UniProtKB/Swiss-Prot annotation:
GO terms for cellular component: cytosol. Activates KDO (a required 8-carbon sugar) for incorporation into bacterial lipopolysaccharide in Gram-negative bacteria. PANTHER family: 3-DEOXY-MANNO-OCTULOSONATE CYTIDYLYLTRANSFERASE, 3-DEOXY-MANNO-OCTULOSONATE CYTIDYLYLTRANSFERASE, MITOCHONDRIAL. The keyword Cytoplasm applies. It is found in: Cytoplasm. This is 3-deoxy-manno-octulosonate cytidylyltransferase.
Protein backbone atom coordinates (compact mmCIF):
# COMPACT_ATOMS: atom_id res chain seq x y z
CA UNK A 1 0.00 0.00 0.00
CA UNK A 2 1.15 3.59 -0.46
CA UNK A 3 2.96 5.18 2.42
CA UNK A 4 0.58 6.85 4.85
CA UNK A 5 0.50 7.64 8.53
CA UNK A 6 -3.18 6.96 9.27
CA UNK A 7 -5.37 4.04 8.23
CA UNK A 8 -9.11 3.71 8.96
CA UNK A 9 -10.31 0.14 9.47
CA UNK A 10 -13.96 -0.87 9.77
CA UNK A 11 -14.47 -4.33 11.31
CA UNK A 12 -17.67 -5.99 10.08
CA UNK A 13 -19.18 -9.41 10.69
CA UNK A 14 -22.59 -10.98 10.10
CA UNK A 15 -22.99 -12.80 13.42
CA UNK A 16 -24.17 -9.92 15.62
CA UNK A 17 -26.02 -11.27 18.66
CA UNK A 18 -28.98 -8.89 18.63
CA UNK A 19 -29.27 -8.10 14.91
CA UNK A 20 -27.66 -10.82 12.76
CA UNK A 21 -26.68 -9.73 9.27
CA UNK A 22 -26.85 -6.04 10.10
CA UNK A 23 -23.88 -4.84 7.96
CA UNK A 24 -25.88 -5.62 4.80
CA UNK A 25 -29.25 -4.33 5.96
CA UNK A 26 -30.67 -1.64 3.69
CA UNK A 27 -30.77 1.95 4.91
CA UNK A 28 -32.05 4.52 2.41
CA UNK A 29 -31.03 2.36 -0.54
CA UNK A 30 -27.54 1.36 0.59
CA UNK A 31 -26.24 -1.41 2.85
CA UNK A 32 -25.29 -0.11 6.30
CA UNK A 33 -21.61 -0.95 5.86
CA UNK A 34 -21.50 1.25 2.74
CA UNK A 35 -22.87 4.23 4.69
CA UNK A 36 -20.08 3.78 7.23
CA UNK A 37 -17.50 3.42 4.46
CA UNK A 38 -18.69 6.63 2.78
CA UNK A 39 -18.49 8.59 6.03
CA UNK A 40 -15.00 7.29 6.74
CA UNK A 41 -13.91 8.29 3.24
CA UNK A 42 -15.45 11.75 3.72
CA UNK A 43 -13.35 12.27 6.85
CA UNK A 44 -10.31 12.28 4.51
CA UNK A 45 -7.75 11.28 7.14
CA UNK A 46 -6.24 8.37 5.23
CA UNK A 47 -7.08 5.18 3.34
CA UNK A 48 -10.14 3.21 4.46
CA UNK A 49 -10.68 -0.55 4.40
CA UNK A 50 -13.34 -2.93 5.71
CA UNK A 51 -11.99 -5.90 7.70
CA UNK A 52 -14.31 -8.90 7.49
CA UNK A 53 -14.41 -12.68 7.58
CA UNK A 54 -17.51 -12.82 5.36
CA UNK A 55 -17.37 -13.06 1.56
CA UNK A 56 -20.86 -11.57 1.25
CA UNK A 57 -19.76 -8.37 3.02
CA UNK A 58 -16.56 -8.27 0.97
CA UNK A 59 -18.51 -8.55 -2.29
CA UNK A 60 -20.86 -5.69 -1.36
CA UNK A 61 -18.04 -3.38 -0.27
CA UNK A 62 -16.04 -4.13 -3.42
CA UNK A 63 -19.11 -3.55 -5.61
CA UNK A 64 -19.40 -0.07 -4.09
CA UNK A 65 -15.77 0.74 -4.77
CA UNK A 66 -14.46 0.04 -1.28
CA UNK A 67 -11.34 -1.79 -0.19
CA UNK A 68 -11.60 -5.06 1.76
CA UNK A 69 -9.19 -7.19 3.73
CA UNK A 70 -10.29 -10.71 4.63
CA UNK A 71 -9.58 -11.81 8.19
CA UNK A 72 -9.94 -14.99 10.23
CA UNK A 73 -13.36 -15.84 11.64
CA UNK A 74 -12.19 -16.71 15.16
CA UNK A 75 -11.13 -13.30 16.48
CA UNK A 76 -12.29 -12.64 20.05
CA UNK A 77 -12.74 -8.89 19.40
CA UNK A 78 -12.81 -6.20 16.75
CA UNK A 79 -9.40 -5.02 17.92
CA UNK A 80 -7.87 -8.39 17.07
CA UNK A 81 -9.56 -8.27 13.67
CA UNK A 82 -8.17 -4.83 12.84
CA UNK A 83 -4.68 -5.81 13.96
CA UNK A 84 -4.72 -8.76 11.56
CA UNK A 85 -6.01 -6.43 8.82
CA UNK A 86 -3.30 -3.87 9.57
CA UNK A 87 -0.61 -6.55 9.43
CA UNK A 88 -1.88 -7.71 6.03
CA UNK A 89 -2.35 -4.25 4.50
CA UNK A 90 0.83 -2.71 5.87
CA UNK A 91 3.41 -5.39 6.65
CA UNK A 92 6.25 -2.86 6.39
CA UNK A 93 4.96 -0.67 9.23
CA UNK A 94 4.41 2.60 7.35
CA UNK A 95 1.10 3.22 9.15
CA UNK A 96 1.59 4.94 12.51
CA UNK A 97 -2.04 5.44 13.58
CA UNK A 98 -5.03 3.13 13.17
CA UNK A 99 -8.63 4.30 13.52
CA UNK A 100 -11.06 1.55 14.51
CA UNK A 101 -14.51 2.62 13.27
CA UNK A 102 -17.40 0.32 14.15
CA UNK A 103 -19.36 -0.93 11.15
CA UNK A 104 -22.70 -0.14 12.82
CA UNK A 105 -22.35 3.67 12.93
CA UNK A 106 -24.15 4.63 9.69
CA UNK A 107 -24.94 8.17 10.90
CA UNK A 108 -21.52 9.08 12.32
CA UNK A 109 -20.31 12.51 11.24
CA UNK A 110 -16.97 12.75 9.41
CA UNK A 111 -16.03 15.50 11.89
CA UNK A 112 -16.20 12.94 14.70
CA UNK A 113 -13.89 10.59 12.83
CA UNK A 114 -11.40 13.43 12.42
CA UNK A 115 -11.80 14.46 16.07
CA UNK A 116 -10.67 11.09 17.43
CA UNK A 117 -7.14 11.77 16.17
CA UNK A 118 -6.71 15.01 18.11
CA UNK A 119 -5.66 13.55 21.51
CA UNK A 120 -2.81 11.69 19.80
CA UNK A 121 -1.10 15.04 19.19
CA UNK A 122 0.20 14.46 22.74
CA UNK A 123 2.94 11.82 22.44
CA UNK A 124 2.12 10.51 25.94
CA UNK A 125 -1.29 9.25 24.75
CA UNK A 126 -1.50 5.62 23.59
CA UNK A 127 -5.15 5.41 22.55
CA UNK A 128 -7.75 8.10 21.79
CA UNK A 129 -11.52 7.84 21.86
CA UNK A 130 -14.62 10.07 22.10
CA UNK A 131 -17.50 10.82 24.45
CA UNK A 132 -20.46 13.19 24.67
CA UNK A 133 -22.13 14.67 27.73
CA UNK A 134 -25.16 12.81 29.10
CA UNK A 135 -28.28 14.96 29.38
CA UNK A 136 -30.99 12.58 30.64
CA UNK A 137 -31.43 10.44 33.72
CA UNK A 138 -32.54 7.53 31.52
CA UNK A 139 -29.22 7.61 29.66
CA UNK A 140 -27.32 7.93 32.91
CA UNK A 141 -29.00 4.85 34.42
CA UNK A 142 -28.85 2.65 31.30
CA UNK A 143 -26.22 -0.12 31.66
CA UNK A 144 -25.95 -0.30 27.86
CA UNK A 145 -24.63 3.28 27.92
CA UNK A 146 -20.95 3.06 28.82
CA UNK A 147 -19.76 5.98 30.94
CA UNK A 148 -16.22 7.27 30.91
CA UNK A 149 -14.79 8.70 34.11
CA UNK A 150 -11.84 10.97 33.56
CA UNK A 151 -9.75 13.90 34.70
CA UNK A 152 -10.48 17.06 32.67
CA UNK A 153 -7.67 18.31 30.45
CA UNK A 154 -9.19 21.58 29.29
CA UNK A 155 -12.75 22.09 28.06
CA UNK A 156 -13.09 19.26 25.54
CA UNK A 157 -10.74 16.55 26.72
CA UNK A 158 -10.45 13.97 29.49
CA UNK A 159 -7.77 11.56 30.56
CA UNK A 160 -9.68 8.33 31.08
CA UNK A 161 -9.45 6.77 34.52
CA UNK A 162 -12.22 4.19 34.14
CA UNK A 163 -15.08 3.01 31.92
CA UNK A 164 -18.22 1.53 33.46
CA UNK A 165 -21.81 0.50 32.83
CA UNK A 166 -22.74 1.86 36.25
CA UNK A 167 -24.06 5.39 36.83
CA UNK A 168 -20.84 7.24 37.59
CA UNK A 169 -19.19 9.36 38.79
CA UNK A 170 -21.22 10.15 41.90
CA UNK A 171 -22.24 13.70 42.83
CA UNK A 172 -22.81 16.92 40.92
CA UNK A 173 -21.24 17.56 37.55
CA UNK A 174 -21.32 16.13 34.05
CA UNK A 175 -21.33 12.47 33.11
CA UNK A 176 -20.07 11.30 29.73
CA UNK A 177 -21.40 8.69 27.30
CA UNK A 178 -18.50 6.81 25.71
CA UNK A 179 -18.51 6.51 21.91
CA UNK A 180 -16.89 3.32 20.60
CA UNK A 181 -14.54 4.92 18.09
CA UNK A 182 -10.80 4.53 18.73
CA UNK A 183 -7.50 5.76 17.33
CA UNK A 184 -4.48 3.67 18.32
CA UNK A 185 -0.82 4.28 17.91
CA UNK A 186 0.37 1.20 16.06
CA UNK A 187 2.59 0.08 18.94
CA UNK A 188 -0.32 0.51 21.38
CA UNK A 189 -2.62 -1.66 19.26
CA UNK A 190 0.06 -4.32 18.96
CA UNK A 191 0.57 -4.33 22.71
CA UNK A 192 -3.17 -4.30 23.41
CA UNK A 193 -3.95 -7.39 21.34
CA UNK A 194 -1.00 -9.24 22.92
CA UNK A 195 -2.48 -8.81 26.42
CA UNK A 196 -4.89 -11.34 27.93
CA UNK A 197 -8.36 -10.12 28.93
CA UNK A 198 -8.10 -8.31 32.25
CA UNK A 199 -10.19 -8.85 35.41
CA UNK A 200 -12.16 -5.61 35.09
CA UNK A 201 -12.59 -6.11 31.35
CA UNK A 202 -14.23 -9.47 32.04
CA UNK A 203 -16.37 -8.05 34.83
CA UNK A 204 -17.68 -4.99 32.94
CA UNK A 205 -17.48 -6.63 29.48
CA UNK A 206 -15.53 -3.59 28.23
CA UNK A 207 -12.30 -4.38 26.40
CA UNK A 208 -10.86 -0.86 26.78
CA UNK A 209 -10.35 -1.62 30.49
CA UNK A 210 -7.63 -4.06 29.43
CA UNK A 211 -5.57 -1.08 28.25
CA UNK A 212 -6.15 0.92 31.43
CA UNK A 213 -5.30 -2.02 33.67
CA UNK A 214 -2.06 -2.45 31.73
CA UNK A 215 -1.11 1.17 32.43
CA UNK A 216 -1.81 2.48 28.94
CA UNK A 217 -3.08 6.04 28.59
CA UNK A 218 -6.45 6.68 26.94
CA UNK A 219 -7.50 10.28 26.30
CA UNK A 220 -11.06 11.22 25.38
CA UNK A 221 -12.20 13.99 23.06
CA UNK A 222 -15.58 15.51 23.93
CA UNK A 223 -17.99 15.94 21.01
CA UNK A 224 -21.49 17.40 20.90
CA UNK A 225 -23.60 14.28 20.33
CA UNK A 226 -23.43 10.50 20.35
CA UNK A 227 -23.72 8.94 16.87
CA UNK A 228 -26.50 6.39 16.76
CA UNK A 229 -25.19 2.85 16.67
CA UNK A 230 -27.40 0.11 15.24
CA UNK A 231 -27.77 -2.81 17.66
CA UNK A 232 -31.51 -3.54 17.49
CA UNK A 233 -34.38 -3.45 15.00
CA UNK A 234 -35.55 -0.20 16.62
CA UNK A 235 -32.09 1.34 16.08
CA UNK A 236 -32.25 0.28 12.44
CA UNK A 237 -35.59 2.02 11.95
CA UNK A 238 -34.21 5.17 13.58
CA UNK A 239 -31.21 5.15 11.24
CA UNK A 240 -33.53 4.69 8.27
CA UNK A 241 -35.54 7.74 9.31
CA UNK A 242 -32.42 9.86 9.83
CA UNK A 243 -30.86 8.91 6.50
CA UNK A 244 -34.07 9.08 4.48
CA UNK A 245 -33.83 12.89 4.36
Amino acid sequence: MTETKTLVLIPARMAATRLPGKPLMDIAGLPMIVHVLRRAEAAAIGPVAVATDTAEIADVVTAHGGRVVMTRADHPSGSDRIFEALSKLDPDGAVETVVNLQGDFPTIQPDNIRAVLEPLADPAVDIATLAAQIHTEEESLNPNVVKVIGSPLGDRRLRALYFTRATAPWGDGPRYHHIGLYAYRRAALQRFVSLPPSPLERREKLEQLRALEAGMRIDVGIVDAVPRGVDTAADLETARRVLAH
